[in-house]
A protein has these predicted regions:
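Short, electropositive alpha-helical surface patch
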Residues: 67-85, 136-156
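C-terminal accessory region of radical SAM enzymes
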Residues: 106-143, 171-221, 227, 237
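A structural motif corresponding to the C-terminal lobe/cap of the Radical SAM core domain
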Residues: 78, 82, 97-123, 153, ...
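Cysteine-cluster motifs in flexible loop/terminal segments that predominantly coordinate metals
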Residues: 211-257
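Radical SAM/AdoMet-radical enzyme domain recognition
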Residues: 1-104
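Short, small/polar residue-rich loop motifs at catalytic or cofactor-binding pockets
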Residues: 157-161
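Short, acidic, Ser/Thr-enriched surface-loop or helix-capping motifs
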Residues: 166-167
Length: 257
């Protein structure tokens, strides 16, 4: 719970941005996260904003909240949230027991259309790296959020290349959706610098060979840049990091999916 005392500690630590999961309207969110969690999250946004902390919401899109995105946006605007990340629920964690809740590849276009239309400046909308790639609307959204000097085009999974995730127990992984067997070390045992600079760390990404990609991805014109998209999507929906990425807008457009 992010109460006033916690907000003060966050501020004192110099943390500038906080992200909180909002996975639907109150009923849907509480079904997923627990009774009362939605209201606590909204109250937390209010306290954080009052303290001048940049607030982000993260929504994991599943079949049961796909039609609630517009209503979620209204509530986030009302709460004064600064940014909103929309990401796909993939069959891992709790969703590994509920594969029917995972959106289909054919739903990507609907999600993209919503993000494109919702990018009205009221809050910054970001599609997570598991949503893409190489469509006009997706590129337009990337341009809106692209830092100066950066190229607004998907350039492959950056896990282990330019960013990493520190889990609650200190484990280091390339991205939050990486499976446990992709853990590179633990900050309670080695320093972050030692782990990051280890020549064998993140080998699955740093030494990835795109020519090993399968299916449509193998012959795709964007392969050298894309490397098959989000690594976690490939692993959890295709079974391996070289599996064809069926959650790709470009692929599905070209194949008429």
């Amino acid at each position: 719970m992010i109460d006033e005392e916690t907000v003060q500690k966050i501020s004192d630590c110099g943390i500038r941005s906080i992200g909180i999961s909002i996975d639907g309207g109150e009923k849907t969110h509480d079904t997923i996260r627990g009774t009362g969690c939605y209201q606590k999250a909204m109250e937390a946004f209010g306290r954080l904003k009052k303290a001048g902390i940049y607030c982000s919401a993260v929504t994991t899109v599943m079949k049961n909240n796909l039609e609630e995105l517009a209503d979620i946006k209204k509530e986030l605007n009302r709460a004064g949230v600064d940014a909103w990340q929309i990401q796909l629920g993939i069959p891992k964690g709790n969703l590994s027991d509920s594969p029917d809740a995972v959106v289909e590849p054919g739903d990507l276009e609907k999600i993209l259309d919503f993000c494109y239309q919702a990018a009205d400046g009221s809050l910054s909308i970001h599609m997570a790296d598991c949503i893409g790639y190489y469509s006009k609307k997706e590129n337009a959204l990337r341009r809106l959020n692209c830092p100066e000097g950066k190229i607004p085009v998907w350039q492959g999974c950056q896990a282990g290349l330019s960013h990493l995730t520190i889990r609650h127990n200190g484990d280091i992984v390339g991205a939050s959706m990486c499976p446990p067997d992709m853990t590179e070390g633990n900050i309670r045992e080695r320093t972050l610098r030692e782990i990051w600079e280890d020549e064998n760390a993140f080998a699955w990404r740093r030494k990835f060979k795109p020519e090993l990609m399968e299916g449509f991805c193998h012959d795709c014109q964007y392969l050298s840049l894309c490397h098959g998209g989000c690594s976690a999507i490939k692993i959890f929906t295709g079974g391996s990091i070289t599996a064809e990425n069926k959650y790709c807008l470009y692929r599905n457009t070209m194949l008429g999916k």
